[in-house]
């Protein structure tokens, strides 16, 4: 049985933890509520001081695998897998094992089933079948079996909870833990941020901003084209790390529009600093299947972006695509608008509408941000 004074919550995440702001939020929430946390992940050295300097926090850093030679990459991946599994074996009686993505469940493998009675399985994406390895089209990892055996399932959005329960025939409805920032402090301004801040301060046009992953399920092209048509009044700033295929296409996109400015990637929470200089924010989700990802075709339709909480917390009204995960909070709280289609004229109308109703949407943002109580939800997951 979990004893808060004696036991810890061991969080496992595959990939660099700094690419997952919701995981940082979870760690901050757990620490602030007096739990001991041990993180097993890549990128631990870049964690914010508020986490690393907490006496209740410890970690095992897994070295990243970066090599163009497929044989060396496979060899290093094998070493990486052993590192995760060794960290799992360090789990003490009563500790909670909290996995953050299906990739780490696949990596931990059958050994994880030994901890099923205290395994919290968090799903950042709406998941169906999962590839045995990245890009695999036929070979599948039985992620459903691990979910059915897990103690608790956690998802970031209510519709996803019901879909996941039915799709995987789960006994209980998953907990809903929104992707909301625990703190909205960007921290000390670093030297590499100064040129970007100065650039945004000098810009006289109204600034539309996108913060987040740059990937196939984000339709930046349509918004860039629309902003270009009203570039005398607006410009578009993109921040984020590219993921997946299509790097050349993204470079062409950046080169094609004079109103578009790509500013690179900044580790969270530093990226929040740039929201101080923005007027409107984008959430450009593109519904559809991403082959080999393991996410269902409904993933983007029922999106649950941490960005809408970051934007709302920083009082930035939003424009998004027409997906239910955005339409519901936008209409309930009046904090943004969804474009019914992605024609330039439709997007421009949305920009003009948000601009005209900016002050009202800013006032409404606080009510939306305050609607989720992370402390209550996380304590319920751990203790119920």
Where in this protein do the model-derived segments appear?
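Membrane-proximal helix-turn-helix segments that form the acceptor-binding/catalytic region
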Residues: 28, 82-91, 121, 127, ...
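Glycosyltransferase donor-sugar binding loop
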Residues: 41, 45, 211, 236-248, ...
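Short His-centered aromatic/hydrophobic patch
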Residues: 99-105, 123
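A charged, aromatic-enriched C-terminal amphipathic alpha-helix characteristic of glycosyltransferases
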Residues: 177-178, 194-195, 341-345, 355-384
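Conserved donor-binding/catalytic core segment of Leloir-type glycosyltransferases
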Residues: 10, 181, 196-218, 224-227, ...
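Nucleotide-sugar-dependent
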Residues: 218, 269-274, 283-309, 320-328
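A short, active-site helix/loop in glycosyltransferases that binds the activated sugar's phosphate group
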Residues: 107-108, 136, 143-188, 328-329, ...
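Nucleotide-activated donor-binding/catalytic signature segment of Leloir-type glycosyltransferases, i.e.
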Residues: 205, 247-280, 290
